[in-house]
């Protein structure tokens, strides 16, 4: 697959030229459902979730048939990461509280690491994931072209990997 980027005044579009033939809408829906976006469990250590979603609705993985040769769908990336600007002061406060509770002058590295892990886990339960949805259009007109509406190399790489797992 070849990845080209075209810049516009308000955004970028990447074109992927695919060798595989586009499946029918029913087969495409089935393939996308197998790799649909899944919510991140805040109790887990997972920080990123990547999957397909709808063109208009990020909660479902249904492709939209625009005309005979164009099908649109979404590529969704969720990231659940506690910002260090939030984690550091909360960890300091929790360490101070633990020192007072245990009547200690200081905590050792292991105690600080344990407090940091507990604070991070508590914050993950309260902080919503950052969601990024990128529209995708698959055209059969010119050499089976897939358009990805992004200028980000990282998003393009994640898309390419998921696309190959789903449709190859």
Question: Which positions does each model-derived feature cover?
Answer:
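A short alpha->loop->secondary-structure connector
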Residues: 154-168
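Short cationic amphipathic helices and targeting signals
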Residues: 14-16, 73, 142-150
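Short, flexible, solvent-exposed loop/turn segments with mixed acidic/basic and small polar residues
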Residues: 2-8, 63-64, 130-142, 161
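Surface-exposed, low-hydrophobicity interaction/linker segments
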Residues: 26-135
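N-terminal alpha-helical "arm" segments
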Residues: 2-28
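Generic structural motif
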Residues: 21-23, 76-82, 141, 153
